[in-house]
C-alpha cells in the first residue's frame, strides 16, 4: 500500500470537518495585546482551553509531550540531567492554564522523563491530570531479547513506569512506535510472541490501565493489521500529523491523511504527535516564513501547524514537547480557545506544503531516539545545523555563486559552534546502531558520511575551485 492509500479529504469535506470542530470552541481567540507587540513577549491566553470528550475524559486539546524536558549539566560532571526545577515550573503553569494530558515514555530524555514527569505531577491532585506512557520494548527487541526473556524485561519496564510516575494506574497506555524496524515481524515479536500483549490486556481488565492504544511510525501494513485484525478494541491511536505530512510524508512514514481517515471512519480518537515535526515547521525556509507572515502577521509560524492539527474533530489532543516557557505560552494562545482553520486556510497550508518539499532538508525531528551514540557523535545537532543552513539560505552550493563565501563561512562557523569537533560527523564509523531507532527512517550513517564529505569540501574550498 502506498502513502496515498485511502480517500482524500476534499476541500469541501475539510470545510465541513472544521466547521464541526468549531462548534466545540467558544470565547475569544488569541492572546492579549502584550503577545502582539514587536517585543515578542507572549501574554496570557484571552480565553479558556479547548477540550475534547472523545474517550469519555475531558481532555485538553493541547497535550504536553514530555520528550523534550529542559536539561542541564550534571553537577557530578557526567552527561546531563533533567532540570527538575524548570520542569516543575512548566508543569505548574500548564495545569493552571488548562492542560491536563501529559505524554511520556521510558526512553524519553535518555531514560529520565518518566521520573521527572512523576515528580512534577505528583505535587498536584491525581484527578487533575491524565498520564500517558508506553510499552517501549523496541530497544529490548533490538538488543536481541526474545520470548520469555523479552516478556520479563517488558514487564519490568511496565512496573518501573508506575514507580517513576508515582501512580497506581495509567490513564492512557500505548504500545510504542509500532511499524518501525522489521515491520510486521518485529510487531509480532514485541507484542504477541513474548506474550506482552496478553499481559497488558489483563492489566487493563484489572483497572491499572484505563485506556489502551498504540503509537505508529513506518510500515503501513502494521497500522492496518492493528486496526483490522488484532482483535484489540483500541481506545485511541497516536499518529504523526501535520500539514506537511498530510500528503507529503517522507522516509518510512505514511501520509497522515490516510492514517487520520482510517481512524475517523472507525471512531477511534487520534492523539497527534509531531504537529511541528520536532520544531521543523517553526524553522522553515525564510521564503515560507514570509509567505505565512504575509497572511497573518501577528500569528507565530508555529501556530499555523498547531491550528492545522487541532482543526480535525476526531483529534483528542495534540502533543507538543514544550521545552521553554515561551513555547508553552504561544501554544496556549493557539488553543485557548482553538480557532479552527477555514477552508481557504486549509488550501493555503497545502499550497505551502507543496512549496516546502522543494527544500531538501533531512527529516530529523530531534526526538533523540538515536542517542546516545557509542562514539559520542551528536547526531541531532549535526542534522539540525544542516537543515538550519538550508532554511536560512546559507547552503553553499556553487563556488561561482556571489553568496558562496558568505554561506561557506556561515556554515563552517555555525557547525563548530553547534557541534563540538569531537562530536561531529567525521567521527562516525558507520556502526549503524542508531538507524533502527529512528522513527523517520533516516539512514543516519549515510547522512553523516555525506555531511562530513560536504564539510571537508568547504574546508578545502574545493567548490570554489570547480
Q: What residue ranges belong to the model's regions?
A:
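N-terminal binding-site loop/beta-alpha segment at the start of enzyme catalytic domains
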Residues: 2-129, 168, 199, 205
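Twin-arginine (Tat) signal peptide motif
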Residues: 6-15, 367-370, 428-434
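Beta/alpha (TIM)-barrel catalytic core signal, keyed to glycine-rich beta->alpha loops juxtaposed to Asp/Glu
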Residues: 44-46, 178-384, 388-409, 436, ...
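Structural preference for beta-strand elements that scaffold enzyme active sites
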Residues: 59-63, 101, 128-132, 169-172, ...
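Short Fe-S-cluster ligation motifs
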Residues: 394-428, 460-466
Amino acid at each position: 500500500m502506498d502513502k496515498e492509500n485511502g480517500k482524500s479529504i476534499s476541500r469541501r469535506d475539510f470545510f465541513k470537518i472544521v466547521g464541526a470542530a468549531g462548534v466545540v470552541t467558544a470565547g475569544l481567540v488569541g492572546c492579549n495585546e502584550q503577545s502582539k507587540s514587536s517585543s515578542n513577549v507572549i501574554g496570557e491566553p484571552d480565553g479558556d482551553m479547548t477540550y475534547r470528550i472523545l474517550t469519555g475524559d475531558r481532555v485538553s486539546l493541547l497535550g504536553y509531550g514530555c520528550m523534550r524536558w529542559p536539561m542541564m549539566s550534571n553537577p557530578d560532571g557526567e552527561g546531563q540531567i533533567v532540570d527538575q526545577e524548570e520542569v516543575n515550573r512548566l508543569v505548574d503553569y500548564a495545569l493552571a492554564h488548562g492542560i491536563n494530558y501529559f505524554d511520556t515514555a521510558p526512553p524519553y530524555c535518555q531514560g529520565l522523563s518518566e521520573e521527572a514527569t512523576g515528580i512534577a505531577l505528583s505535587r498536584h491532585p491525581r484527578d487533575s491530570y491524565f498520564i500517558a506512557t508506553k510499552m517501549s520494548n523496541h530497544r529490548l527487541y533490538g538488543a536481541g531479547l526474545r520470548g520469555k526473556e523479552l516478556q520479563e524485561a517488558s514487564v519490568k519496564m511496565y512496573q518501573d513506569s508506575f514507580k517513576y510516575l508515582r501512580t497506581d494506574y495509567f490513564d492512557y497506555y500505548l504500545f510504542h512506535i509500532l511499524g518501525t524496524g522489521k515491520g510486521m515481524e518485529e510487531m509480532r515479536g514485541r507484542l504477541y510472541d513474548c506474550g506482552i500483549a496478553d499481559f497488558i490486556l489483563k492489566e487493563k481488565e484489572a483497572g491499572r490501565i484505563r485506556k489502551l492504544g498504540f503509537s505508529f511510525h513506518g510500515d503501513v501494513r502494521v497500522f492496518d493489521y492493528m486496526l483490522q485484525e488484532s482483535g484489540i478494541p483500541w481506545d485511541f491511536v497516536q499518529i504523526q500529523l501535520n500539514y506537511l505530512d498530510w500528503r507529503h510524508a517522507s522516509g518510512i512514514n505514511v501520509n497522515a491523511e490516510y492514517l487520520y481517515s482510517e481512524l475517523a471512519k472507525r471512531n477511534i480518537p487520534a492523539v497527534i504527535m509531531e504537529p511541528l515535526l520536532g520544531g521543523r515547521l517553526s524553522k522553515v525556509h525564510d521564503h515560507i516564513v514570509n509567505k505565512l507572515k504575509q497572511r497573518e502577521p501577528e500569528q507565530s509560524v508555529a501556530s499555523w501547524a498547531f491550528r492545522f492539527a487541532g482543526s480535525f474533530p476526531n483529534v483528542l489532543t495534540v502533543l507538543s514537547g514544550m521545552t521553554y516557557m515561551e513555547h508553552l505560552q504561544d501554544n496556549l494562545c493557539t488553543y485557548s480557545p482553538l480557532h479552527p482553520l477555514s477552508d481557504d486556510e486549509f488550501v493555503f497550508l497545502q499550497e505551502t506544503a507543496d512549496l516546502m518539499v522543494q527544500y531538501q532538508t533531512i527529516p530529523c525531528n530531534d526526538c533523540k531516539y538515536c542517542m546516545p551514540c557509542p562514539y559520542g557523535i551528536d547526531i541531532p545537532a549535526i542534522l539540525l545545523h544542516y537543515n538550519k543552513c538550508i532554511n536560512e539560505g546559507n547552503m553553499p552550493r556553487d563556488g561561482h555563486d556571489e553568496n558562496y563565501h558568505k554561506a561557506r563561512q556561515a556554515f563552517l562557523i555555525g557547525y563548530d559552534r553547534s557541534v563540538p569537533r569531537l562530536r561531529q560527523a567525521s567521527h562516525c564509523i558507520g556502526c549503524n546502531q542508531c538507524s533502527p531507532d529512528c522513527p523517520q527512517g533516516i539512514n543516519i550513517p549515510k547522512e553523516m558520511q555525506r555531511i562530513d564529505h560536504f564539510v571537508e569540501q568547504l574546508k578545502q574550498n574545493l567548490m570554489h575551485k570547480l
